[in-house]
């Protein structure tokens, strides 16, 4: 019991860590590694679309074909369809099941391989799946208790991250709307011309050249840039005789400008 309690505390302590660490292509790699160590297994966290958010391989169980899926950070579509129909934790799935994560061509190498799949829920929604597997040894009751706790912890983290992303999207859209509402028709025309001039999201431009081409004064462009910069939509830097360096910080401005075309 003491060992189970200690492991439970280790899992719940993950919630106390900042979600700022959940960055990069595989934001849940560290979490998967911690859970794999605690439960003593391989572990993978996938979202509802099958994208791999993080994984940890304590034990070698894959071949080159399956390694490619992990490197691509996307599990096979047919496998994701299968696990999406797992609504409650299914433990100790054998090597012959379609739900096993072991490669079919390695059945003879891992005849006792076992997979456990736990759905991840958050806010009443299915957010993904927590998959763990071993070369042998059943997942016993203590392991399954930890799996249930782990899937809940991951679900809370996923939901929190989704909420933060939504709040950031709303903040950015609000900034764009407020900035656009301060622009005159000529300034909106100038902003469209400026952004079309960029190579991607940043680049160098000459305000006077753009002004002459679209038939407005240079001051209109300067005022438009100043308003966008104060709203945090762009950043600019004078390059002297070479013009102005411009970088777009809020990409939503492109979609907003389409409404005025």
From Swiss-Prot:
<dbReference type="Pfam" id="PF08222">
    <property type="entry name" value="HTH_CodY"/>
</dbReference>
<keyword id="KW-0963">Cytoplasm</keyword>
<dbReference type="InterPro" id="IPR014154">
    <property type="entry name" value="CodY"/>
</dbReference>
<dbReference type="Pfam" id="PF06018">
    <property type="entry name" value="CodY"/>
</dbReference>
<keyword id="KW-0238">DNA-binding</keyword>
<dbReference type="InterPro" id="IPR029016">
    <property type="entry name" value="GAF-like_dom_sf"/>
</dbReference>
<dbReference type="InterPro" id="IPR013198">
    <property type="entry name" value="GTP_trans_reg_CodY_C"/>
</dbReference>
<dbReference type="InterPro" id="IPR036388">
    <property type="entry name" value="WH-like_DNA-bd_sf"/>
</dbReference>
<keyword id="KW-0805">Transcription regulation</keyword>
<comment type="function">
    <text>DNA-binding global transcriptional regulator which is involved in the adaptive response to starvation and acts by directly or indirectly controlling the expression of numerous genes in response to nutrient availability. During rapid exponential growth, CodY is highly active and represses genes whose products allow adaptation to nutrient depletion.</text>
</comment>
<keyword id="KW-0804">Transcription</keyword>
<dbReference type="GO" id="GO:0005525">
    <property type="term" value="F:GTP binding"/>
</dbReference>
<dbReference type="InterPro" id="IPR011991">
    <property type="entry name" value="ArsR-like_HTH"/>
</dbReference>
<dbReference type="GO" id="GO:0045892">
    <property type="term" value="P:negative regulation of DNA-templated transcription"/>
</dbReference>
<dbReference type="GO" id="GO:0005737">
    <property type="term" value="C:cytoplasm"/>
</dbReference>
<dbReference type="GO" id="GO:0003677">
    <property type="term" value="F:DNA binding"/>
</dbReference>
<keyword id="KW-0678">Repressor</keyword>
<dbReference type="InterPro" id="IPR010312">
    <property type="entry name" value="Transc_reg_CodY_N"/>
</dbReference>
<comment type="similarity">
    <text>Belongs to the CodY family.</text>
</comment>
<feature type="DNA-binding region" description="H-T-H motif">
    <location>
        <begin position="207"/>
        <end position="226"/>
    </location>
</feature>
<protein>
    <recommendedName>
        <fullName>Global transcriptional regulator CodY</fullName>
    </recommendedName>
</protein>
<dbReference type="GO" id="GO:0003700">
    <property type="term" value="F:DNA-binding transcription factor activity"/>
</dbReference>
<feature type="region of interest" description="GAF domain">
    <location>
        <begin position="1"/>
        <end position="159"/>
    </location>
</feature>
<dbReference type="InterPro" id="IPR036390">
    <property type="entry name" value="WH_DNA-bd_sf"/>
</dbReference>
